[in-house]
């Protein structure tokens, strides 16, 4: 994951100091892309320990179409707590848009199921896209989608995925986002009887928060270690039937974790 450290250094060297919605302040770049060959290892940051439990359970929560934090709390995952209301509700965030996008005619669109169907039956389509950026419902969401739009691409028996992330907290959020969409690509490939290709991450406002600078310096002082491998222990009947126990990360040997405050 040298490319991740390179991005951090590029922000420090070339970024612009900006204000932001949270009032914290950032150093920011606009427009950056990284590519990960998923056959060469699972792209999980090794220069600090990442909380795998949160990454996996959050993705399963998205795929279930859930928008209440109750399931996450049951699994010991607190990453959405700061944005939830007193009942744990978040409004129509990712899970709602992925699984039940409201159409103008009153229909509900399951974008994930449609993507699976297109990959299987129309793999050359240039429209295998899932969007969480529903302009008509942004005001109802506790947090507007940061990882907003992703597209699948099939070539030579391999499935690739590209994510567009409009806003990216590089220190805290980006390692989660890369791992989450890499995991989703593996799952979709398995369901569609394909090998994995590349995960391409494209960022818009790519930033380091001003209160993450010491943590960033510590991480930049560390040498990346070999990437782990992902093992999926079974093939469920559908993309929606995976369980936490189905996944194992092999050979993950990270440096110690680094704590940092979340900008709310």
From Swiss-Prot:
Main site of residence? cytoplasm
Which residues are the active-site ones? 146
Residues noted as binding (6R)-5,10-methylene-5,6,7,8-tetrahydrofolate in the record, renumbered to the chain? 51, 169, 263
Cite the annotated pathway. Answer: Pyrimidine metabolism; dTTP biosynthesis
* Top-level taxon: Bacteria
Sequence positions that bind dUMP: 21, 126-127, 166-169, 177, 207-209
Pfam families per record = Thymidylat_synt (PF00303)
Q: Which reaction does it catalyse?
A: dUMP + (6R)-5,10-methylene-5,6,7,8-tetrahydrofolate = 7,8-dihydrofolate + dTMP
Report the sequence similarity comment from the record: Belongs to the thymidylate synthase family. Bacterial-type ThyA subfamily.
Subunit-structure text: Homodimer.
Q: What is this protein called?
A: Thymidylate synthase
| UniProt source species | Aeromonas salmonicida (strain A449)
């Amino acid at each position: 994951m040298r490319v991740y450290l390179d991005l951090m250094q590029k922000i420090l060297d070339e970024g612009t100091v900006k204000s932001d919605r949270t009032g914290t302040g950032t150093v920011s770049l606009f427009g950056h892309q990284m590519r990960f060959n998923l056959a060469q290892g699972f792209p999980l940051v090794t220069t600090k320990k990442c909380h795998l439990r949160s990454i996996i359970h959050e993705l399963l929560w998205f795929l279930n179409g859930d928008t209440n934090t109750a399931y996450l709390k049951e699994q010991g995952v607190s990453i959405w707590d700061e944005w939830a209301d007193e009942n744990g509700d978040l409004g129509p965030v990712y899970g709602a848009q992925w699984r039940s996008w409201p159409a103008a005619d009153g229909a509900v669109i399951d974008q994930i199921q449609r993507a699976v169907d297109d990959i299987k039956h129309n793999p050359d389509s240039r429209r295998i896209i899932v969007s969480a950026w529903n302009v008509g419902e942004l005001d109802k969401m506790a947090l507007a989608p940061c990882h907003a739009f992703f597209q699948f691409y099939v070539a030579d028996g391999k499935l690739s995925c590209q994510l567009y992330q409009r806003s990216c907290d590089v220190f805290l959020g980006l390692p989660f986002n890369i791992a989450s969409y890499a995991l989703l690509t593996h799952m979709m490939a398995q369901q569609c009887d394909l090998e994995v290709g590349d995960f391409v991450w494209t960022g818009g406002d790519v930033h380091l928060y001003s209160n993450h600078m010491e943590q960033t310096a510590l991480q930049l002082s560390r040498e990346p270690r070999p990437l782990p491998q992902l093992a999926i222990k079974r093939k469920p009947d559908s993309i929606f039937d995976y369980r936490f126990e189905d996944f194992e990360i092999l050979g993950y040997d990270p440096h110690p974790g680094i704590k940092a405050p979340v900008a709310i």
